[in-house]
């Protein structure tokens, strides 16, 4: 491959490589902190593009978007401006697993994010392909593009996503490509490997898109948006929420035995099973051919037909991800109820790409090998726009703080789902595309959709990404919550006829004695609005989000206190720092497997060491004694 002659270009504080969901958050965070930031990407028409599902949020992921917003990130604001449908999921379950999901106008989402980037001070957007890094004495000093431009920087964030040596596969067809048939980045991976980084090969996939004009909607089940307003951003207003009639519906259908037979008959042409695909695919988002083989007892699989936007007829067939040959895909699509006459506008495909094994990162997302070099998003082995954006935000903040000579930030597992994800990646690594799930969080009752601001907005203000005006509104919300909680704790409800009729209607026993309003509200069937039927209302009406906090904090108080007690115990473990450059082989009594894992991952705290697979409690106890007694054996320089 021919390269341009190298020449000295401009210097920046921070350079972000790749303008996907991770790169956009990283660049905006850095620039908003006052760093001169360059965001360089292969194609300016693909900024924050959605090459896979046209949606944001869902279980765990939706909470990540709220966390990004609570700290001053952009994804929540952007989807609130460009959604075509909004739904709160798991409303019949407890608050720990409720999650917001928005159907996006994918083109408008990209346009809006690009506009935001272009209007942000200190942020320069450029088209280009980064082929190499400038490294001096183990520290990154800039990047080199394929045209030869050498840009200097104090920190660099790599968010190359599936473009890193990307290869698209459709049946027997294979070709080098980034997502959605964009140009791939071929040289950067080679140069990262030369620097000593361990790279892995992962795979993801996408389903066919069909022409909405050729769908028979009468044979599907409509999935409309919510009537009640909800938003990803704490800054969005209820009056701006789209009425249901202005939202676009999704449509539910299913595969059937005929669909499964078509797939079974063509498994000999499926790259998943012929050995063509080398990369490891996502466990929690398998291709349809993988589902048919793994779950052969299931007679059908759920599919959602999702609109890709207001100004396109393309529908995304969620649940039908595939890399089967194009003609097989068309036959498969037409076997499905409602899609008998559907015209495919784009075939599904698999894409292989390079990832940096994430155990090579610190919890700040800086690489251990090269100072000042950060990685985020699918580059680190995750799947999903939200996971990428969460990492991008943290990497951008830390790259920006490093450029200013400030201490970097880390999020603990008890702080945020973003903290859970990063800790999982750097402590355990991943052998497949990592997806955030509520089950990965041991403190999920305190890591809720509704309280992301209470957990993280103070941090966002400290790092300079939450304005004083927004912070004052946040402080006012907190004050209102506490004032109303105090008011309710002093009011007693008397056992009159009206109250007893209400409790008996809900199958409860009548009151014999008076009860505090707070205790009454703790009953599962009592809402705050029910409570106001029996007690005076507050002097000023309360916002629904304040009321939501009051209800949750009272109803789940006992469980929440138990989780916070666990968090305090964890904090004591996190406070026990492990000195750098330990020779674990010289610590007597630690099992060989544990020595090898500890040496490879180099945990920074005793708590992190305890989460490494292969390190058992006995190993941890010995390590703790060595740390406390100062017996640590360091590696000689």
UniProtKB/Swiss-Prot annotation:
The cofactors named for this UniProt entry are: FAD
Name the source's superkingdom: Bacteria
**Subcellular localization, per the record?**
Cytoplasm
Which SUPFAM superfamilies did the record assign? Answer: FAD/NAD(P)-binding domain
User: Pfam families from the xrefs?
Assistant: GIDA (PF01134), GIDA_C_1st (PF21680), SAM_GIDA_C (PF13932)
Task: Write out the GO biological process terms.
Answer: tRNA methylation; tRNA wobble uridine modification
- Which of this chain's residues are annotated to bind FAD? 18-23
Q: Where does NAD(+) bind?
A: 281-295
* Keyword vocabulary terms for this entry: Cytoplasm, FAD, Flavoprotein, NAD, tRNA processing
Q: Which GO terms describe its cellular component?
A: cytosol
Q: What is its main location?
A: cytoplasm
A GO molecular function assigned to this protein is: flavin adenine dinucleotide binding
Q: Which InterPro entries match?
A: FAD/NAD-bd_sf, GIDA_C_N, MnmG, MnmG-rel, MnmG-rel_CS, MnmG_C, MnmG_C_subdom, MnmG_C_subdom_sf
What PANTHER family does this protein's entry cite?
Answer: GLUCOSE INHIBITED DIVISION PROTEIN A, PROTEIN MTO1 HOMOLOG, MITOCHONDRIAL
Q: Which family does it belong to?
A: Belongs to the MnmG family.
Q: How does it assemble?
A: Homodimer. Heterotetramer of two MnmE and two MnmG subunits.
The record's listing under HAMAP family reads: MnmG_GidA
* Role noted for this protein: NAD-binding protein involved in the addition of a carboxymethylaminomethyl (cmnm) group at the wobble position (U34) of certain tRNAs, forming tRNA-cmnm(5)s(2)U34.
Q: What is this protein called?
A: tRNA uridine 5-carboxymethylaminomethyl modification enzyme MnmG
The protein's gene is named mnmG
């Amino acid at each position: 491959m021919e390269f341009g002659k190298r020449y000295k270009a401009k210097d920046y504080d921070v350079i972000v490589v790749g303008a996907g969901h991770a790169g956009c958050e990283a660049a905006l965070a850095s620039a908003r902190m006052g760093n001169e930031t360059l965001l360089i990407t292969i194609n300016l028409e693909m900024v924050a593009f959605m090459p896979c599902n046209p949606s944001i949020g869902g279980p765990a992921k939706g909470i990540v978007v709220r966390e990004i917003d609570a700290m001053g990130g952009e994804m929540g604001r952007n989807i609130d401006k460009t959604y075509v449908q909004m739904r709160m999921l798991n409303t019949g379950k407890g608050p720990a697993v409720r999650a917001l999901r928005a159907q996006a106008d994918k083109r408008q989402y990209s346009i809006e994010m690009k506009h935001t980037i272009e209007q942000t001070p200190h942020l320069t957007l450029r088209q280009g392909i980064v082929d190499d890094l400038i490294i001096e004495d183990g520290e990154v000093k800039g990047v080199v593009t394929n045209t030869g431009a050498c840009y200097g920087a104090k920190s660099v964030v790599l968010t190359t996503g599936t473009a890193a040596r990307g290869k698209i596969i459709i049946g027997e067809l294979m070709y080098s490509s980034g997502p959605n048939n964009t140009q791939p980045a071929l040289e950067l991976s080679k140069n990262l490997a030369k620097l000593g980084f361990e790279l892995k090969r992962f795979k993801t996939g996408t389903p066919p898109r069909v022409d909405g004009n050729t769908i028979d909607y009468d044979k599907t089940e409509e999935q409309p948006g919510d009537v009640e307003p909800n938003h990803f951003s704490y800054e969005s207003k209820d009056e701006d929420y789209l009425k249901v009639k202005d939202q676009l519906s999704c449509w539910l259908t299913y595969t059937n035995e005929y669909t499964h037979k078509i797939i079974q008959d063509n498994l000999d042409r499926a790259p998943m099973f012929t050995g063509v695909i080398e990369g490891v695919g996502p466990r929690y988002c398998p291709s349809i051919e993988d589902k048919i083989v793994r779950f052969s007892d299931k007679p059908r699989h759920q599919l959602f037909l999702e609109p890709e936007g207001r100004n396109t007829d393309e529908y995304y067939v969620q649940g039908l991800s595939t890399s089967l040959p194009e003609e097989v895909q068309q036959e498969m699509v037409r076997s499905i109820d409602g899609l008998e006459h559907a015209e495919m506008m784009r075939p599904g495909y698999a894409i292989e790409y390079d990832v940096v094994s994430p155990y090579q990162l610190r919890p700040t997302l800086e690489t251990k090998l090269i100072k000042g070099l950060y990685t985020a998003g699918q580059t680190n082995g995750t799947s999903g726009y939200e996971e990428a954006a969460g990492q991008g935000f943290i990497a951008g903040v830390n790259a920006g703080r490093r450029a200013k000579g400030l201490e970097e930030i880390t999020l603990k597992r008890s702080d945020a789902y973003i903290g859970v994800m990063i800790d999982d990646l750097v402590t355990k690594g991943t052998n497949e595309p990592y997806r955030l799930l509520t089950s990965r969080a041991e403190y999920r009752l305190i890591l809720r959709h509704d309280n992301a601001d209470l957990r993280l907005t103070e941090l966002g203000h400290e790092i300079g990404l939450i304005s004083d005006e927004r912070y004052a509104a946040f402080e006012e919300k907190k004050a209102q919550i506490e004032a109303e909680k105090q008011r309710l704790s002093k009011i007693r409800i008397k056992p009159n006829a009206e109250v007893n009729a209400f409790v008996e209607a809900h199958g409860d026993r009548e009151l014999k004695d008076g009860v505090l309003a707070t205790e009454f509200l703790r009953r599962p069937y009592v809402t705050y609005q029910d409570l106001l039927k029996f007690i005076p209302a507050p002097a000023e009406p309360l916002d629904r989000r304040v009321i939501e906090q009051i209800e949750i904090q009272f109803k789940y108080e006992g469980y929440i206190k138990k989780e916070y007690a666990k968090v305090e115990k964890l904090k004591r473990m996190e406070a026990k720092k492990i000195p750098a450059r330990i020779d674990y082989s010289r610590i007597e009594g630690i099992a060989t497997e544990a020595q090898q894992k500890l040496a490879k991952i180099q945990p920074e705290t005793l708590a992190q060491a305890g989460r490494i697979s292969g390190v058992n409690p006995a190993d941890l106890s010995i390590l703790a004694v060595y740390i406390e007694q100062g017996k640590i054996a360091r590696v000689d320089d």
